[in-house]
């Protein structure tokens, strides 16, 4: 079994280092070998130039492909993994084209796993835990008015001009700003094409409270069902959003 780790960008290195340090057989693929060597070369010498044909030729049944490349590569890599009888992992949102591979993956007996980062990923676990705890509490009543907010964002220690800590490809951050969002505000669906049209203020309940700018991220609505919301609930607010330092907008 070999782990084929594709991409050595900003968010790749901690997980990649850990796998290598734990002794797992890892082959690193990157579009620029020199950049990968600079980032991870002290941990492994098995670094290869990323090329779809080369990756496909190297895949064997039981291998795992981890895609930390830009989103356009996820589906082609997942298809290649399924065809080879290998598993696939990414931290990105599940695109419709990725979801369409579900049955093929099941028939091949392999796992195709996405949304396993911080957001999306760990936030899903926390949301499921929160909803389950609410359902099991004495406060639960199907007639209650329910509000759910989940915010995540990279915050620099010292404010920079972009008011954001880049932990993944800057071009990806900018492209995300072009995605429309849908959420629930005051019991009504709110759809905006530009995030800055739905900015609000959020005070984080920290030991020393701090206020941030927040805005809805993508389409929040499907996550109500995924998190176990009862269709009968009166949802006053449901937002999965992005957090930024004040002054971002």
Q: What do the PLM-derived regions correspond to, one by one?
A:
Residues 63-68, 89-90:
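N-terminal Rossmann-like NAD(P) cofactor-binding module of classical short-chain dehydrogenase/reductase
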């Amino acid at each position: 079994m070999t782990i084929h780790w594709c991409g050595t960008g900003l968010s790749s290195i901690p997980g990649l280092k850990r796998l290598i340090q734990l002794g797992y057989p890892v082959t690193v693929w990157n579009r620029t070998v020199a950049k990968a060597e600079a980032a991870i070369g002290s941990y492994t010498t098995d670094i290869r130039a990323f090329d779809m044909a080369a990756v496909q030729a190297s895949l064997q049944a039981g291998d795992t492909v981890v895609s930390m490349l830009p989103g356009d590569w996820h589906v082609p890599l997942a298809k290649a993994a399924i065809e080879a009888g290998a598993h696939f992992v990414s931290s990105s949102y599940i695109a419709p084209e990725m979801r369409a591979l579900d049955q093929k993956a099941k028939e091949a007996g392999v796992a195709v796993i996405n949304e396993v980062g911080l957001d999306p990923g760990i936030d899903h676990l926390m949301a499921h835990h929160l909803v389950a705890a609410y359902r099991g509490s004495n406060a639960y009543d199907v007639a209650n008015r329910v509000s759910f907010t989940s915010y995540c964002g990279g915050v620099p220690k010292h404010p920079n001009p972009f008011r954001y800590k880049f932990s993944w490809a800057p071009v990806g951050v900018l492209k995300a700003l072009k995605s429309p969002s849908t959420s629930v505000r005051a019991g009504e669906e709110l759809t905006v094409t530009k995030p800055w049209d739905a900015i609000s203020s959020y005070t984080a309940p920290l030991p020393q409270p701090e206020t941030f700018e927040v805005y809805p991220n993508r389409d929040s609505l499907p996550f109500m069902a995924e998190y176990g919301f009862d269709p009968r609930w009166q949802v006053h607010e449901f937002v999965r959003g992005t957090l930024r330092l004040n002054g971002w907008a």
